[in-house]
């Protein structure tokens, strides 16, 4: 179905354009395309787009050389770039826009298509891609036939087209990424773009060869180490084999000793049995003789025992009588002691009476003296004047002081309460400030974790603020404080992280000082921003928020956060935060109406961000929406106004606290004055009161003392009478003591008589007892010897039986160990046996001792057996397997050595192959880089700048780390610096990128190159120079097709006949393509030029 005529847009090229033939390709390799009528295989003849991005339908016919695609922003220039990429099976990631191919279909359409016709010798190639929005899938056709994407990719690859290579295809969104490419990535992209087809393959082979070489080197090293360890291990095993045979020799000796041991034990038992029999016969004879010698001694002991019995009875009787007499003596002695104690108590009582009477007389004397003194003092007091009026005056002044103190105490209590309240308020305010400062530290830690260079620069700034004349602000994410943590995600999604971590300067000279220190000297990758000279922080939004509330918008982005004036001014200028409304879920449901009715460029719904671009001509709107990611930094919010207010309140509170403290000290001084005056008045009152009551007190004291004196005089004791009574009591007790003493003397005499009689009896009994003791001692010695002899005879009999049985058992065990029958005797062969242990690596056998020459005593055999066992136990962990293991390891070492030799030979062969492959790759590569460097250097020299391109590698053998290094210098007072995303400005990076691509242009191995809006950010001088270089390079005969997309052109530029200028316009009032007369248009332009 034909497209509506008014929407068709066709770009055609004048057929009279001239082209040059392409000559031979550099380095002598065959080109992918062949030159036919000025075109290379793979160059683009036609691009047709239907319902694609901003286009309903359009056809583009580019020329064979330089194609300048010019048009205002939003007209659809980049749409042509997108069509080339997607139409040639490129990935959406290459474009850096939407990640789904369905997003490239025009809004409101269900499908769109791209058709690209490529020149190919023998028949052009037409590739068609139809994109379906519903399932986000594409249908492919080649020359009208249905094919899959893989087939299209193969066709494109065969034509040397690489839309993913930034050296060939550089879309607008990827311009900045060119400078971010590593040296290695740039080298690979250059190889693919302008190198021979086999160059990149050789490079990949070299990297693979090098990787395999490393693997072989590691294998050889590991095998060498393994063989060395195996040899060491086998050497240890050889030692274990020696130890195994040594252990076996000891075990054989143990076996031989264990065979002889029972025979030696049997012989020892037999000899001991003969000795026991002889000893038993001798013991029996001695026992019989001892029994005959004991009989007379027993009879003599019996006679003495009969004589001792009467003496024993008499001594017991005397002992009882002596005990009775002693008891009586003790009783009388106790009675005498009690009487003596009674006399002492009577005398003590009399002495106490005397002391009491003496004290009584002293008290009477003292009382009389006190009465006289009191009468004298009373006479003096009666002469003093009346003190009552003065006491009344003192009481009045004390009451006035008490009233004043109550007033001061009330004021002090009120001030103390106010002081406590002020202290509590200060603590609360200080805590809030500390909490805010802690939140700022958390944000700073997050910054350090994300970008350490920025954090290092922040520390330097804080230490060197005195070096700057104007305001210098820390990174924006530390200066921005969102008013509600829920708003943080909108601010972060709108402002790039590169700006959030940027330092903001009020003065440009301060920024230059800062960047010179941290970027050039400290080599830190930081961003800095100069605030606008005219503040825009208070710029008004284009529409009142009240007019937008019906769509769900509730505020503008600027109102969601606070920031210093310079920071806010920059954000308003750069990000238009004062014109970015934020809406709710209602906004999302009304998004189509919002897009159509409101003239907005950026807006937020509850969880999405929309970017709108309105075409200048057609007024059509293209939108890009993306999800709002959660906040990472700004959700930690600190209200700067609240913080400032808290600091002011804290200062006011501390001032009030100090004022209250000073007033309290003044009141304390007043209280001290009152206290001193009260003490003086109370002392005076006390003195006057004492003086007033002293007369009455003296009279009372005199009366009391006189009463006490009369009572003491009436209670006088008669000591003479008491003394007579004491003497009579002592005399009566002494009479009782005389009677007791007489009885005590009689008892003592009786006890002495009985004791003498007992002594005489004991002496006679001791004589008989001594004689009996001697006889009993002699008898006990004989009886003990008799019992000992009897026990010895019994023990010998038992030992004889035990040894007999033991000998039989030992004989049976010895024959069993030697494998003999019960009736056999020890053979001569066993007596003289020899044992040989022959290790496989020894030449001479080592005989063991003969059986007959082994020790002949059990102790010697046990000693030797223990020694052999101890020695054999020293050889732990050994078995027959150690010999097998030794032999097996020896064989394995020989096999490994053979394998190692094979690996070394293979490694040497691999190194030879690498050397040959290196020559095939490195020499052409150096020539290619040298050619690029010549062009690049010449281009920069023509711009009065300096630049060079070289092949860079850290180590010659690390082929995966080879890279192309671009170094440039734009100012005469600086040195060459490597092209990075950080050191050069955006315009400088664009110039460098463009000139590098121009350096590749004449080496043209690719059919075409595309560069989209790379001149953005260039200053006019550099832009004019770059344009001249592009025209001069891309319009030569031997060059590939070139697409240069730009929204603007400077005046009075130089053009070439080989150029094709494609002007892109759109709008509601565009002239339909079928009514466009390009010849008439050119004629009118020439006429206007002639008139001018």
From Swiss-Prot:
Q: Which GO terms describe its cellular component?
A: chromosome, telomeric region; nucleus; PML body; Smc5-Smc6 complex
Name the InterPro entries on file. P-loop_NTPase (IPR027417), RecF/RecN/SMC_N (IPR003395)
**Encoded by which gene?**
smc5
Main subcellular localization, coarse class? nucleus
Q: Where is the composition biased (Polar residues)?
A: 12-22
Give one GO term, molecular function aspect.
Answer: ATP binding
Entry coiled-coil feature ranges: 146-449, 636-806, 878-921
Region Disordered, residue ranges: 1-27
Oligomer and partners: Forms a heterodimer with smc6. Component of the SMC5-SMC6 complex which consists at least of smc5, smc6, nsmce2, nsmce1 and nsmce4a.
Chain's role: Core component of the SMC5-SMC6 complex, a complex involved in repair of DNA double-strand breaks by homologous recombination. The complex may promote sister chromatid homologous recombination by recruiting the SMC1-SMC3 cohesin complex to double-strand breaks. The complex is required for telomere maintenance via recombination and mediates sumoylation of shelterin complex (telosome) components. Required for sister chromatid cohesion during prometaphase and mitotic progression; the function seems to be independent of SMC6.
User: In this UniProt entry, which cysteines form S-S bonds?
Assistant: none
- Transmembrane intervals: none
Residue sites binding ATP per the record: 71-78
* An individual GO BP term: positive regulation of maintenance of mitotic sister chromatid cohesion
* Protein name as catalogued: Structural maintenance of chromosomes protein 5
Cell compartment(s), UniProt: Nucleus; Chromosome; Chromosome, Telomere
Report the source organism.
Takifugu rubripes (Japanese pufferfish)
Q: Which UniProt keywords apply?
A: ATP-binding, Cell cycle, Cell division, Chromosome, Coiled coil, DNA damage, DNA recombination, DNA repair, Mitosis, Nucleotide-binding, Nucleus, Telomere
Listed Pfam families: SMC_N
Q: Which family does it belong to?
A: Belongs to the SMC family. SMC5 subfamily.
Q: Record's domain comment?
A: The flexible hinge domain, which separates the large intramolecular coiled coil regions, allows the heterotypic interaction with the corresponding domain of SMC6, forming a V-shaped heterodimer.
Q: Where is this region: Flexible hinge?
A: 450-635
